[in-house]
């Protein structure tokens, strides 16, 4: 599997994990401990869509414009996956259900893997897009 395809696969895995976490958030919003009351299911879905657009933009830039610019945006996209850890700033791990913790941790782990791969590609310094 070439690097471009590997990057796309990792992005799709992270996007799936992130979507799963966000859907769980939206469906069980009032069960998440100490979430502000102004956070709504609709807002959760819109947030995920905005984050996904960043990922799509990053991959488009990577493939069509500039590998380094694309990888920077993909890195930002991956960093946003660490936002799930914010749940633990407002309530301890023990206050969350197993499903909540699993959805948070899987999102963070997949974000970390994507971020690491994007950083590796940056270090390798590829100059132009390769065909998929």
Locations of regions flagged by a protein language model:
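Interfacial segments of alpha-helical transmembrane regions
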Residues: 1-14, 66-75
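Membrane-water interface at the C-terminal end of transmembrane alpha helices
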Residues: 3-10, 108-132
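Interfacial helix-start motif at the membrane-water boundary
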Residues: 38-54
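Non-cytosolic membrane-interface motifs at loop->transmembrane helix junctions
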Residues: 33-43, 94-107
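Hydrophobic alpha-helical membrane segments
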Residues: 44-47, 69-89, 108-113
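Hydrophobic transmembrane helix segments
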Residues: 10-42
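Membrane-helix boundary connector in multi-pass membrane proteins
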Residues: 63-70, 83-104
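Juxtamembrane helix-break-helix junctions at the cytosolic face
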Residues: 53-69, 125
């Amino acid at each position: 599997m070439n690097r471009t395809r590997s990057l796309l696969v990792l992005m799709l895995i992270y996007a799936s994990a992130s979507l799963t976490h966000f859907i769980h958030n939206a469906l069980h919003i009032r069960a998440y401990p100490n979430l502000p009351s102004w956070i709504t299911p609709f807002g959760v879905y819109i947030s995920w869509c905005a984050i996904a657009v960043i990922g799509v933009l990053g991959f488009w830039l990577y493939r069509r414009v500039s590998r380094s610019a694309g990888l920077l945006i993909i890195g930002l996209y991956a960093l946003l996956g660490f936002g799930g850890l914010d749940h633990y700033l407002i309530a301890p791990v023990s206050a969350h259900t197993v499903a909540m913790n699993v959805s948070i941790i899987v999102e963070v782990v997949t974000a970390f893997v994507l971020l690491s791969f994007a950083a590796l590609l940056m270090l390798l310094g590829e100059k132009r897009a390769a065909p998929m």
